[in-house]
C-alpha cells in the first residue's frame, strides 16, 4: 500500500493498475480538498465514515456513511469534511489528471511530487 500525505489528510493507494485505481481517502474534520476537475478521470466515491459536503459543479450536497456519488469529467468538485471522514475512491487510472481551480495550499495542477516522496 502506498500512502500519500496531503495537507487535508492522506490517501492510501490500495491498487493502481492499467484499468482502475482504488484509494482510501482520510480527510481531517474541517479540511477540504482543492476545487478541481479532470479531463479524463472518472471517479466514484463511497462514504465509509463521517459527513462530507461536496460541491458538484454549482450544487452543494451532503453525503453520510453509506452514500456514494460519481464525478464525471469535467465536473468541478470539492469535498469538505464536516467530521473526520473516510472515503473509498474507485477511479479510472489517470491519477495525475487534476486541474486545480483553487487550493488552500496553493498547490499546482497534477501530481505533487513532494506528497509522494515518502510513499
What are these regions (language model features)?
Residues 1-36, 41:
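A short glycine-rich, His/Asp/Glu-containing loop-to-beta-strand
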Residues 2-6, 78, 82-119:
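Double-stranded beta-helix
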Residues 24, 44, 59-61:
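Short, surface-exposed secondary-structure edge patches
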Residues 34, 54-56, 89:
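Short hydrophobic/aromatic-rich beta-strand segments that constitute the beta-sheet cores
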Residues 40-53:
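Glycine- and acidic-residue-biased ligand/ion/polar-headgroup-sensing regions
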Residues 51-53, 68, 76, 84-86:
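Structural motif
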Amino acid at each position: 500500500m502506498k500512502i500519500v500525505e496531503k495537507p487535508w489528510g492522506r490517501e492510501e493507494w490500495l491498487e493502481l493498475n492499467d484499468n482502475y485505481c482504488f484509494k482510501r481517502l482520510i480527510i481531517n474534520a474541517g479540511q477540504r480538498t482543492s476545487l478541481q476537475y479532470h479531463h479524463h478521470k472518472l471517479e466514484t466515491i463511497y462514504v465509509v465514515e463521517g459527513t462530507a459536503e461536496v460541491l458538484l459543479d454549482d450544487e452543494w450536497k451532503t453525503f453520510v456513511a453509506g452514500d456514494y456519488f460519481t464525478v464525471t469529467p469535467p465536473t468541478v468538485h470539492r469535498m469538505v469534511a464536516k467530521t473526520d471522514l473516510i472515503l473509498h475512491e474507485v477511479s479510472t487510472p489517470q491519477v495525475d489528471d487534476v486541474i486545480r481551480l483553487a487550493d488552500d495550499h496553493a498547490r499546482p495542477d497534477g501530481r505533487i511530487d513532494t506528497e509522494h516522496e515518502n510513499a
